[in-house]
């Protein structure tokens, strides 16, 4: 029997998820289909219910439905609870829905694949939206020494700090801080741009002196060419830049494993996807 999976979003035609999951399934002999479903902005719950009623086993969720998906879940992973959003839904045997957030896990997996252990690293996270919030717990659990969050609206960065310093009786209290963008000083091992500024060819207003010859810069955005943020980072002398394509594949792999109990080969799929991206018409 072939199991049914899907990704819900609006818009959704650009989604790489059907290609990625198809590539994951092929060498593992997993019998499944995976489609992209355009849900009306005001009709996500109805679309999801219809999908599950028609035999759907699990689903990914993208913009703008991650918070709605969170609200529909009967149970949540620790990552999803703290992210306040869900990108992976699983229909359990008892008919309940479990929600996971694999975005941050995908980011960490990609960072480790590129850099090795994150233990003791000093990380600057630019942005304080949903993408930033979803990666904080996985980064802290990966053993980073310090996480500095900086955002145009400082109160949003401070809100994230308040959320995560209250976790586990303050277990992370000394490792997460918020700093105004124009007050950033010191050296960071890794700088992560979680904003979508690169999509418009723009840069977050951070000072150039935060980049040193040892700094690795990571842009969650990706494209056929180097992103605007990563181009800027290289021009300021960054040691290495990485885009978010590996995070996309990584989060998909975590979803696939949750559903199927099988760990797919991400590097093969990442190479295929990179080649596919470069071949697309500009």
From Swiss-Prot:
GO terms for biological process: amino acid biosynthetic process; aromatic amino acid family biosynthetic process; chorismate biosynthetic process; shikimate metabolic process. NADP(+) binds at residues 127-131, 151-156, 220, 244. SUPFAM superfamilies: Aminoacid dehydrogenase-like, N-terminal domain, NAD(P)-binding Rossmann-fold domains. Gene3D superfamilies: Leucine Dehydrogenase, chain A, domain 1, NAD(P)-binding Rossmann-like Domain. GO terms for molecular function: NADP binding; shikimate 3-dehydrogenase (NADP+) activity. The active site is at 66 (proton acceptor). GO terms for cellular component: cytosol. It holds the Pfam family SDH_C. Its EC number is 1.1.1.25. It is an enzyme of class 1 (oxidoreductase). It catalyses: shikimate + NADP(+) = 3-dehydroshikimate + NADPH + H(+). Keywords: Amino-acid biosynthesis, Aromatic amino acid biosynthesis, NADP, Oxidoreductase. Homodimer. This is Shikimate dehydrogenase (NADP(+)). It comes from Shewanella sp. (strain W3-18-1). The lineage of its organism: Bacteria, Pseudomonadati, Pseudomonadota, Gammaproteobacteria, Alteromonadales. The gene is aroE.
